[in-house]
Amino acid sequence: MVSHRAARRKRASATDLYRTCKQSGTCPPDVVDKVEGTTLADKILQWTSLGIFLGGLGIGTGTGTGGRTGYIPLGGRPNTVVDVSPARPPVVIEPVGPSEPSIVQLVEDSSVITSGTPVPTFTGTSGFEITSSSTTTPAVLDITPSSGSVQITSTSYTNPAFTDPSLIEVPQTGETSGNIFVSTPTSGTHGYEEIPMEVFATHGTGTEPISSTPTPGISRVAGPRLYSRAHQQVRVSNFDFVTHPSSFVTFDNPAFEPVDTTLTYEAADIAPDPDFLDIVRLHRPALTSRKGTVRFSRLGKKATMVTRRGTQIGAQVHYYHDISSIAPAESIELQPLVHAEPSDASDALFDIYADVDNNTYLDTAFNNTRDSGTTYNTGSLPSVASSASTKYANTTIPFSTSWNMPVNTGPDIALPSTTPQLPLVPSGPIDTTYAITIQGSNYYLLPLLYFFLKKRKRIPYFFSDGYVAV
């Protein structure tokens, strides 16, 4: 019987093994050295390359590539043509010493060029002849102006390199004619033309913003948020917290201590006040009004815990001291100037309330009665008023008596009188019988007030002379 041997399974490549086993740390040493290039051969090449330059030869432990130019066949080296570019001549640099001038001439010096005209030659050996004479006639100059025209030309140039910028000269004008040069005068009275200035494209009221994004009119600054849940509220009853806040944190007593700035301290194990333990910073004070008091507040930060890095961790505490209370506003009770007295009970007996649709009926009736010219001698007759109730309001209208009486609206208010009144004493027994006297002429009933449109009540309400019918 022939035994079959199991086929040997091929091992994975070093690169595949390195990818899978590097993260777990179970790679064989030969795989790690081969992939990372730390084998003995690689180390020998690294040490040798420190003294011998082997660059470009392709020597290594990896796959051979033949270097930069590749492998050369054994038959021989192929012919190569090398292109040689023409060499540029070097530029000669001439150094300039410190004593030599630094002015470089743009045009080189050239020789004298002759125009071809012959140069005159002087003959003779006697030299120059000098003649002297004497004249006794004085020299007289004729200053009479000639009859011809005089032409004067003037040209002015302005060179900014030689002109003082602080001096301003008036520009001059020149002429090349027969007239004498006249410059612009700088003093005296001159004639000028007054041209009024005009404004173009005017629109608006002049209060429009001059920028595309105007600044808002009111900008409010948010106050400190001292009453949030992140701040611990601590009340300080000692008034020294306003003037000397450091006396609550440290035992030092400085000569000068600013009270309107932020104060910084070092964390101490013991504080004069237990509420200020571990305080490292007290912010600047703030004055607020809360619940009717003026409150002085400071926000403090504690350094309860300090990490190794130096970070300070602690709570924020709001210390406050109530300086004074704000008095409530005074409330002044207003008193009525006129006291309305209740009307007499007898006036209520003569009030008649009627439901009408229009006040025109009443106005027509009373105007006709008031315009009558009949007068009566009645002595002291009472003035009876009637209140007519409409759909919209109640109107009080006084009835007309025997004389002409104007119609007044509104309630009657009896003003207080200072005249003393004697008490009324009855002269005899009270009689329950009443005598009603109707005084007037013939009368007639108005049909407009006798019959109503909505409520047909055939009841006469009053007579034409203004007295109540009984």
UniProtKB/Swiss-Prot annotation:
<dbReference type="GO" id="GO:0044174">
    <property type="term" value="C:host cell endosome"/>
</dbReference>
<dbReference type="GO" id="GO:0003677">
    <property type="term" value="F:DNA binding"/>
</dbReference>
<keyword id="KW-1176">Cytoplasmic inwards viral transport</keyword>
<dbReference type="GO" id="GO:0043657">
    <property type="term" value="C:host cell"/>
</dbReference>
<dbReference type="GO" id="GO:0046718">
    <property type="term" value="P:symbiont entry into host cell"/>
</dbReference>
<feature type="short sequence motif" description="Nuclear localization signal">
    <location>
        <begin position="1"/>
        <end position="12"/>
    </location>
</feature>
<keyword id="KW-1163">Viral penetration into host nucleus</keyword>
<keyword id="KW-0946">Virion</keyword>
<dbReference type="GO" id="GO:0005198">
    <property type="term" value="F:structural molecule activity"/>
</dbReference>
<keyword id="KW-0167">Capsid protein</keyword>
<dbReference type="GO" id="GO:0075732">
    <property type="term" value="P:viral penetration into host nucleus"/>
</dbReference>
<protein>
    <recommendedName>
        <fullName>Minor capsid protein L2</fullName>
    </recommendedName>
</protein>
<keyword id="KW-1039">Host endosome</keyword>
<dbReference type="Pfam" id="PF00513">
    <property type="entry name" value="Late_protein_L2"/>
</dbReference>
<feature type="short sequence motif" description="Nuclear localization signal">
    <location>
        <begin position="451"/>
        <end position="459"/>
    </location>
</feature>
<keyword id="KW-1160">Virus entry into host cell</keyword>
<keyword id="KW-1040">Host Golgi apparatus</keyword>
<keyword id="KW-1048">Host nucleus</keyword>
<keyword id="KW-1015">Disulfide bond</keyword>
<dbReference type="GO" id="GO:0019028">
    <property type="term" value="C:viral capsid"/>
</dbReference>
<comment type="function">
    <text>Minor protein of the capsid that localizes along the inner surface of the virion, within the central cavities beneath the L1 pentamers. Plays a role in capsid stabilization through interaction with the major capsid protein L1. Once the virion enters the host cell, L2 escorts the genomic DNA into the nucleus by promoting escape from the endosomal compartments and traffic through the host Golgi network.</text>
</comment>
<keyword id="KW-1177">Microtubular inwards viral transport</keyword>
<keyword id="KW-0238">DNA-binding</keyword>
<dbReference type="InterPro" id="IPR000784">
    <property type="entry name" value="Late_L2"/>
</dbReference>
<comment type="subunit">
    <text>Interacts with major capsid protein L1. Interacts with E2; this interaction inhibits E2 transcriptional activity but not the DNA replication function E2. Interacts with host GADD45GIP1. Interacts with host HSPA8; this interaction is required for L2 nuclear translocation. Interacts with host importins KPNB2 and KPNB3. Forms a complex with importin alpha2-beta1 heterodimers via interaction with the importin alpha2 adapter. Interacts with host DYNLT1; this interaction is essential for virus intracellular transport during entry.</text>
</comment>
<keyword id="KW-0426">Late protein</keyword>
<keyword id="KW-0945">Host-virus interaction</keyword>
<dbReference type="GO" id="GO:0075521">
    <property type="term" value="P:microtubule-dependent intracellular transport of viral material towards nucleus"/>
</dbReference>
<dbReference type="GO" id="GO:0042025">
    <property type="term" value="C:host cell nucleus"/>
</dbReference>
<comment type="similarity">
    <text>Belongs to the papillomaviridae L2 protein family.</text>
</comment>
<dbReference type="GO" id="GO:0044177">
    <property type="term" value="C:host cell Golgi apparatus"/>
</dbReference>
<feature type="disulfide bond">
    <location>
        <begin position="21"/>
        <end position="27"/>
    </location>
</feature>
<keyword id="KW-0597">Phosphoprotein</keyword>
